[in-house]
């Protein structure tokens, strides 16, 4: 279970989180949403302890393996398949030890653990993941340096998926995938047996793959159960209800204030007016949940340019 308790964090004096709290149950797949700059990627860095929190705490089980994609796979001479296989460090180390161990008891322990982690099907699993992300059998045998940075990002994604971390952090994973790869990833995430947090603007992925939404807004965290469309509906209803309550309270405050203004200096009503004034002072203002205003842009139609628009000379 991932627990975020009273998290506070600021960058250059700008607060991103202020006493924010949330709980993500183990095994849940959660979409992270919020406006650009709200702190989504920062939250991942705080979870991975790359940055220190200013206040509060983020609790992750001590034995949890956390994985994510930070950069593309190196442009090495190692094949794509071997690069992915090497991402499961425990499997890699156990297989290497099995080749050199001579103690019968230790060999038994190694092979038992290899069975537990499904190590012997590793090559088939790695090949299947690479195929899902667009690499055929021939491509899987080629060295990484033969592929562009975008394709090596897919290799890095394949590697972390193969490693099966207990907490998988994905930041806009469909940005470097084609449609087929994105559809495959949606299915993979939905079936993944561990916890997944995925930052994405891909509404389709958030409707097909996740079981909850963590919304970052106003320096806080709010967890919603369900897929993205359910979150959007619930969020809209909450906005409408809060605005309705605010309007009712505003009307009540105006009514009370009008009574006070009218009768506070009238002897027969002064006590009532004073009582109403105290009632007004004790009333906690209801603030509507604000949605930041989206700036609008107007691009005027440009004037035609006289020819020639562009001249290339001895290029």
Locations of the language-model features?
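ABC ATP-binding cassette signature C-motif
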Residues: 1-244, 293, 298-315
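Intracellular alpha-helical coupling/juxtamembrane segments of multi-pass membrane proteins
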Residues: 234-259, 263-290
């Amino acid at each position: 279970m991932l627990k975020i308790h009273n998290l506070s964090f600021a960058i250059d004096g700008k607060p991103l989180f202020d006493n924010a709290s949330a709980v993500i149950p183990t095994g849940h797949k959660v979409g992270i949403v919020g406006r650009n700059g709200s702190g989504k990627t920062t939250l991942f860095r705080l979870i991975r302890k790359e940055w220190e929190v200013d206040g509060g705490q983020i609790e992750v089980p001590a034995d949890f393996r956390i994985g994510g994609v930070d950069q593309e796979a190196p442009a090495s001479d190692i094949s794509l398949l071997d690069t992915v296989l090497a991402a499961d460090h425990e499997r890699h180390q156990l297989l290497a030890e099995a080749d050199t161990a001579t103690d019968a008891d230790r060999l038994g322990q190694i092979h038992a653990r290899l069975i537990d982690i499904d190590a012997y099907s590793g090559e088939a699993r790695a090949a299947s993941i690479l195929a899902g992300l667009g690499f055929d059998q021939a491509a899987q045998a080629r060295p990484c340096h033969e592929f562009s940075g975008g394709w090596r990002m897919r290799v890095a994604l394949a590697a972390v998926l193969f490693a099966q971390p207990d907490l998988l952090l994905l930041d806009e994973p469909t940005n470097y995938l084609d449609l087929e790869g994105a559809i495959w990833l949606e299915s993979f995430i939905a079936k993944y047996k561990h916890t997944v947090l995925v930052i994405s603007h891909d509404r389709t992925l958030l409707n097909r793959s996740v079981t909850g939404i963590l919304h970052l807004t106003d320096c806080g965290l709010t967890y919603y159960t369900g897929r993205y469309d359910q979150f959007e509906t619930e969020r809209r209803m909450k906005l409408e209800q809060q605005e309705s309550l605010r309007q009712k309270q505003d009307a009540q405050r105006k009514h009370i204030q009008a009574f006070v203004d009218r009768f506070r200096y009238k002897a027969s009503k002064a006590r009532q007016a004073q009582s109403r004034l105290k009632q007004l002072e004790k009333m906690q203002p209801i603030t509507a949940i604000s949605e930041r205003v989206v700036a609008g842009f107007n691009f005027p139609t440009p004037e035609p340019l006289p020819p020639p628009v562009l001249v290339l000379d001895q290029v």
